[in-house]
């Protein structure tokens, strides 16, 4: 198993390796990924073969807040911090459902959460958690191809 992924001790951790990085991977996600709209978040997702830098990490995630919608850096940073925390607390929905076999490492899901509301009133952590929980459940039930052992993701 991926260290810390489904263990009892660090179930809710969000290690650095799970944060999506790299211009080519991110641009591929934005150009070819599917989209799922929520109330104030947009989720862009893609399932593919693992990248060389992180072959054993089943889910990689990215959080962005546009400068045009939220001009103040302090507000953008607060929103990204809230999104990261909400995802960290709700990611078990996704990781348990994927039933990732680290020995195979045959697929990787990339997610990008984009904040798309104005910064007039920043939502609370509970609202972010509810939104991300709803989006992850919707992603698993309708959008993401089956990823159980034996199935393939193209």
UniProtKB/Swiss-Prot annotation:
One of its GO terms (molecular function) is tRNA binding. InterPro entries: Ribosomal_Su5_D2-typ_SF, Ribsml_uS5_D2-typ_fold_subgr, RNase_P, RNase_P_CS. The keyword RNA-binding applies. One of its GO terms (biological process) is tRNA 5'-leader removal. It catalyses: Endonucleolytic cleavage of RNA, removing 5'-extranucleotides from tRNA precursor. Its EC number is 3.1.26.5. Gene3D superfamilies: 3.30.230.10. Keywords: Endonuclease, Hydrolase, Nuclease, RNA-binding, tRNA processing. The keyword Lyase does not apply. RNaseP catalyzes the removal of the 5'-leader sequence from pre-tRNA to produce the mature 5'-terminus. It can also cleave other RNA substrates such as 4.5S RNA. The protein component plays an auxiliary but essential role in vivo by binding to the 5'-leader sequence and broadening the substrate specificity of the ribozyme. Belongs to the RnpA family. HAMAP family: RNase_P. Consists of a catalytic RNA component (M1 or rnpB) and a protein subunit. This is Ribonuclease P protein component. The gene is rnpA.
